[in-house]
C-alpha cells in the first residue's frame, strides 16, 4: 500500500497587520453614551438633593399596633431558632425557610457594623398593615410584607406567639 505524502498544515494568516490598530472593543459612541448616562444620573440626583425633593417608595408611617423582641439565631444554611430575649426557645426550625434568610441578613448587617453579639430584633406590626423587622443594634430594618404572603405569615406567627 502506497503512502500518500502528508501536506504541511495550512498556515493561518496573521490577524494583526503591522502598523494597523486593533478593532475597538467598545465603540466610542457607546462609551460616550455610557458616560452621558452616568453624568445625567449624577445631575438628577444632585437636583433632587438640592431642591429637597421628597423620597419615593418610602413606607408610609403608622402607629405601632404590636411588637415583639426576639433573638434570631442562624444555626446553619437551613436551620434557625427563634427565642425570646431571656433565651427561651420559641421556635426551632430545622427547615427555617424565610426566617433563616432573615436571620442570615441580620447576621450580615451586624458583621458589617462589627457587632459580635446577638441582641434581639423587633418585629413590629403597624396600623396601616405594615409588618417590619428592625434591628436596634445596627439601625437595619426590612419590610416583611414585601416578600409575599407566606413570608409575612411566618413572622406574624412569631409576633402572635405568647
UniProtKB/Swiss-Prot annotation:
Biased composition annotated in UniProt, kind: Basic and acidic residues: 13-23
Region Disordered, residue ranges: 1-23
Top-level taxon: Bacteria
InterPro entries xrefs: PuhC
Protein name: Uncharacterized 17.4 kDa protein in puhA 5'region
Amino acid at each position: 500500500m502506497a503512502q500518500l505524502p502528508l501536506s504541511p498544515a495550512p498556515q493561518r494568516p496573521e490577524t494583526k497587520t503591522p502598523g494597523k490598530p486593533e478593532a475597538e472593543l467598545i465603540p466610542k459612541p457607546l462609551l460616550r453614551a455610557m458616560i452621558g448616562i452616568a453624568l445625567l444620573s449624577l445631575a438628577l440626583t444632585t437636583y433632587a438633593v438640592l431642591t429637597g425633593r421628597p423620597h419615593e417608595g418610602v413606607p408610609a408611617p403608622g402607629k405601632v399596633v404590636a411588637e415583639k423582641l426576639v433573638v434570631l439565631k442562624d444555626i446553619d444554611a437551613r436551620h434557625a431558632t427563634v427565642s425570646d430575649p431571656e433565651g427561651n426557645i420559641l421556635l426551632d426550625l430545622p427547615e427555617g425557610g424565610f426566617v433563616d434568610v432573615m436571620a442570615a441578613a441580620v447576621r450580615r448587617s451586624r458583621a458589617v457594623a462589627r457587632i459580635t453579639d446577638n441582641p434581639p430584633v423587633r418585629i413590629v406590626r403597624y396600623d396601616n398593615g405594615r409588618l417590619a423587622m428592625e434591628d436596634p443594634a445596627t439601625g437595619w430594618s426590612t419590610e416583611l410584607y414585601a416578600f409575599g404572603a407566606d413570608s409575612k405569615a411566618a413572622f406574624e406567627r412569631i409576633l402572635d406567639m405568647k
